[in-house]
Amino acid sequence: MLGQYGRFRKQVPLATLDAWIGQLEGWREIDTTCQSNFTAKEVLAAWDAWQLFLVDLSQRETIQHRRASLVLLVKPVRDSDDDRLISTALANVERLKHEGDKLITKAISWVLREAIKRHRDAVAAYVAEHESTLPAIAVREFYKKYRTGKK
């Protein structure tokens, strides 16, 4: 529904989105709600609020909020070269990289891979510097996409 009604999506307060995220179960519901629904243009238009929201999500006790802190950035980092987006994405990765739950490790891999399109040098430098502390699957999938262009 969020994807089909952009005009209404822009009117959804972040507090409402936060409440919705808190009701989600599993990766499919989180990803359907958070990935590709919010564009870089929309996020950047209200950057101060979004940046605080994304950082806050990454520090929550609930795993669905922590996953959302990464998944909400997948489309924006893929579609915009704005440094604020990749900086926030990498800061959230840094906060969450020690978690072993697949919901987080796969989200880390996803946001790193999608960032290659617009932030190739920055994300490659980050992965090279933090390779030993990032989830192994994220490093493996990142380098495959980086080298071949394919997942």
Question: Predicted regions span which residues?
Answer:
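Alpha-helical scaffold domains
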Residues: 1-151
